[in-house]
Amino acid sequence: MIEFTLSKINLLILVVALFSIISFFTLNVGKIFLVGEVRQELEKYSLTLNGMVIAPTTCDSKPFAIPSKFVSFGNNVFYTLHLSRAPDPLGSRLIFAASDIRSPETVLAASSLATDAEIRVYDLVGGQVVELGELEDLILDPQAVPPRNAFYAVKTVIGGQETLHAFPCAITANSQTCFGNGSIKEQVSQYLVANGGRAFIC
């Protein structure tokens, strides 16, 4: 009877151990796939912007819609996307970093673009355009209401100086705030003129 009980206990221990190992493996594999998916998305932004910067054009612009969420092994992972600029030996660096919305201090993945162009990042605070300083984050949250699920990039070349501008906007099924009359692009353009710069021409 004692041997039978011990065998059952050993079997239970084995089952629990196997369950723990499988759960640990699944969790870690899921995290690896998630990080890879997020990094791939961020690198897509960096590569596209790099192509915009090195192209022989004097003005270019493009909206970037970001995913509403990422999915890892059937689980929805909601996140925030952080854009910031930092100094770099080449000139400037535009940094993209995605954080799990449940754990904002946890960076899922990051990517960056180093360029000799000047980088300027703007936010909209209380309806007013604000230019962010170095390492200040522009935070996009596709789950916010109203959504901040896109950013817009504009490349300008004035007097030989190339500048890459980035600012937030929203794209929904029925509307967008990125460009056009009354758009955030128009507001940033007006901000530049008011501060001695030139309006966007593209």
Placement of each model-derived feature along the sequence:
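N-terminal single-pass transmembrane signal-anchor helix
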Residues: 1-30
